Amino acid sequence: MLQPSNRKYRKDFKGRNRGIASRGNRVSFGEFGLKATECARITARQLEAARRTIARHIKRGGKITIRIFPDKPITKKPLEVRQGKGKGSVEYWVALVQPGRMIFEIEGVDEALAREAFSRAAAKLPLKCLFVKRTVM
């Protein structure tokens, strides 16, 4: 599963996930993309499950590019522990995703196969997604 190898600080503030994606919102590396249409926190496990689904569906056909990275640590205190005594330990990692952000890209497969692979992967993710094609300018 994806997680940063080293960070300056182990724990983050909670923060808010607002706005729309101004960067990473175009198909850059492949021919087809899976684009987020709402805000969400995607965990490293969800991302890996979606990636495996795509890889299994396209078999050895194309190349998959993951455009997001889970770099935000989410902490949790153990069960039945009173409040106070500092922040809990890191439980898992998430990627904050805004509407318009590209999540996955595929190249080297036909459109029907890519569309089906992305629809199966979108079922594993906690947000609504859209299938997009690369536009040539």
From Swiss-Prot:
Pfam families: Ribosomal_L16. SUPFAM superfamilies: Ribosomal protein L16p/L10e. GO terms for biological process: translation. InterPro entries: Ribosomal_uL16, Ribosomal_uL16_bact-type, Ribosomal_uL16_dom, Ribosomal_uL16_sf. GO terms for molecular function: rRNA binding; structural constituent of ribosome; tRNA binding. Keywords: Ribonucleoprotein, Ribosomal protein, RNA-binding, rRNA-binding, tRNA-binding. One of its GO terms (cellular component) is cytosolic large ribosomal subunit. Belongs to the universal ribosomal protein uL16 family. Part of the 50S ribosomal subunit. Binds 23S rRNA and is also seen to make contacts with the A and possibly P site tRNAs. HAMAP family: Ribosomal_uL16. This is Large ribosomal subunit protein uL16. It comes from Coxiella burnetii (strain RSA 331 / Henzerling II). The lineage of its organism: Bacteria, Pseudomonadati, Pseudomonadota, Gammaproteobacteria, Legionellales. The gene is rplP.
